[in-house]
A protein has these predicted regions:
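Residue-level signal for short, function-critical loop segments
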Residues: 57, 162, 230
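C-terminal substrate-binding/catalytic lobe of Rossmann-fold NAD(P)-dependent oxidoreductases
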Residues: 80, 84-85, 89-224
């Protein structure tokens, strides 16, 4: 449901009715549990919850990186976080899908090229990105949509001097943080990248997320990348995972 409809419906439901909401309406509401089971302590909260808000796609990628950094003390809450998100056009909803898939689309058009948007720095996922990550300030975020259907990567640069950590500490901390995660895989620091880079649609058709970490030769700059399907772990896959937990089913039942 759209945000307004979700807010209108909720007062009509009994408190003991289990609700899984996919809009942005309740993601920062203290009365709701955030639907990212891999965050520390979150799985048990979701299991026992009657109100779970499914994360936004871009937010999922950013939070998967920023939350552990702050929670583990690898970066301060005051750190000036920024990120870039690259997505297939399905991430823009029905209107954008129709635009990209229109039979009237010219053979060569502006849609062939990546498009940055949200340049007013007020993307609707920013409130949850800040709150769930435990940040003192709103992160700077620029999304980019490209001419392919689905798949997403979110890139978070980290100045290790400002963060007060080493690359090894960051890599070890994040690996331990997600060691028991059912749907998140952490790659080793500077692990050889497939095809010397990361294609944003590499995880398309899956409900999993993979995290990559690289560091420069000087050891003072890192790039952390969350790679997943915006329609999978960034949307319906996350919803199914949370539903399974709320209903007492196997966490990954029905997931790819």
């Amino acid at each position: 449901l759209p945000d307004a409809a979700s807010k209108e419906v909720m007062p009509l439901l009994r408190p003991d009715v289990k609700v899984l909401d996919t809009s942005t309406a309740f993601r920062t509401d203290a009365a709701w549990d955030y639907g990212f089971p891999e965050l520390a302590g979150q799985k048990e909260k979701i299991k026992n919850s009657c109100r779970v808000a499914v994360p936004g796609c871009y937010a999922s990628g950013f939070i998967s990186i920023a939350r552990p950094l702050v929670e583990l003390g690898l970066a301060p809450a005051e750190y000036p976080f920024s990120c870039t998100g690259i997505s297939g056009y399905s991430g823009g909803g029905k209107k954008m899908i129709a635009e990209y898939e229109s039979a009237d689309r010219p053979a060569h058009s502006k849609l062939d090229a990546p498009k940055s948007y949200g340049l007013g720095l007020a993307h609707k996922h920013l409130p949850e990105m800040q709150k769930i990550s435990g940040l003192a300030h709103t992160p700077m975020f620029v999304p980019v949509v490209c001419d392919y259907y689905c798949g997403m990567q979110v890139l978070v640069p980290l100045d290790l001097t400002l963060a007060g950590s080493t690359a090894e500490q960051v890599a070890e901390g994040i690996a331990v943080y997600y060691k028991d995660a059912a749907t998140v895989k952490v790659h080793a620091l500077n692990e050889a990248l497939p095809e010397n880079g990361l294609y944003s649609n590499a995880m398309a058709g899956t409900d999993r997320m993979e995290l990559y970490m690289t560091v420069n030769a000087a050891g003072d700059q890192m790039m952390l990348v969350s790679l997943f399907d915006n329609l999978g772990k960034g949307s319906s896959g996350a919803a199914v995972q949370c539903m399974n937990l709320m209903l007492g089913l196997e966490e990954t039942k029905g997931l790819e």
